Regions:
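SAM/dcSAM-binding transferase cores
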Residues: 198-244
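Short, structurally constrained coil/turn elements
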Residues: 11, 88-89, 179-182
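Conserved SAM/SAH cofactor-binding pocket of Class I
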Residues: 34-127, 150
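SAM-dependent Rossmann-like transferase core, predominantly class I methyltransferases
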Residues: 2-43, 49-51, 56-61, 202, ...
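Mobile active-site "lid"/loop adjacent to the S-adenosyl-L-methionine
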Residues: 118-147
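Conserved beta-strand segments of alpha/beta enzyme cores
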Residues: 16, 66, 91-93, 184-187
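Conserved Class I SAM-dependent methyltransferase catalytic core
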Residues: 25, 142-193, 197-199
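Conserved beta-strand termini and adjacent loop/short-helix elements that scaffold enzyme active sites
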Residues: 20, 97, 188-191
């Protein structure tokens, strides 16, 4: 890959990440990383890692953890590998693989955490982007939600956690697939742009082989009075400082 097509984005705490036109990140990834890193993590797998943002945010704050970033895109893995090397994320391991072949490249049944910011749209739903890399990130062209959760269940150890974000309209499907694969939904949080707005995103944690019992957290509001809410300022914290 031509390195001139990448640029470094500050993450705070003296860390940065390389992004490309095809592999960047948004607010949903930052929120998912914050949602996931509240748990005790020794070994985590980020499925569909892209530029690696979720894994790198976890490692920025939990440097002793080990994170395996998995993506089918060689371009994404190249950028993530360069970030790990250039900015000192020594416990990040990039893996270029699809889900079918992953068992040959990564140990199953032993990880504390799987995180995934999946394609939000089903394969044939809505308009698609002509750029195949962007299309793959947004639509389930390479794997379905069912595929992701089935592989997550195999990666996790007993009591390991799956943390995902998704669109509210697919929440029922997400919870059903988790339960069918012995990942019990245990924590749910909705995200709204501001008070009075419909939910924009859902954050969900499921626990492998856990008892039933779902906790619903208070809503997270991105904006208050036209500005970032206090909670968003906390979440963006050192990342925002890196852009000051």
């Amino acid at each position: 890959m031509d390195e001139s097509l990448m640029h470094a984005e500050p993450l705070g705490n003296g860390k940065s990440i390389y992004v490309t036109k095809n592999h960047t990140f948004g607010t949903d990834a930052v929120l998912l990383a914050d949602f996931a890193k509240k748990y005790k993590i020794k070994s985590a797998v980020d499925l569909g890692t892209g530029c690696g943002i979720i894994g790198f945010l976890i490692l920025r704050d939990l440097p002793e953890a080990k994170v395996f970033g998995v993506d089918i895109s060689e371009e994404a893995i190249f950028a993530a590998e360069k970030t790990a090397k250039d900015f000192g994320f020594f416990n990040f391991t990039p893996i270029c693989s699809n889900l079918t072949e992953l068992k040959c490249k990564l140990e199953f049944g032993c990880h504390d955490l799987v995180v995934c910011n999946p394609p939000y749209k089903a394969k044939n739903a809505g308009l698609t982007n002509e750029n195949m890399k962007i299309k793959t990130a947004r639509h389930e062209t390479e794997c379905s939600l069912k595929d992701i959760i089935e592989v997550s269940a195999k990666l996790l150890k007993t009591s390991g956690k799956l943390c995902m974000c998704h669109r509210p309209e697919r929440l029922a499907e997400l919870l059903r697939l988790m339960s069918e694969n012995k990942i019990e939904p245990k924590r749910l949080r909705i995200v709204c742009k501001s008070k009075g707005c419909e939910p924009w995103l859902v954050l969900v944690t499921g626990v492998r082989c856990a008892n039933t019992g779902l906790r619903i957290d208070p809503p997270l509001f991105v904006y208050e009075n036209g500005k970032f809410s206090e909670e968003m300022l906390r979440i963006y914290g050192t990342y925002k400082e890196g852009h000051a």
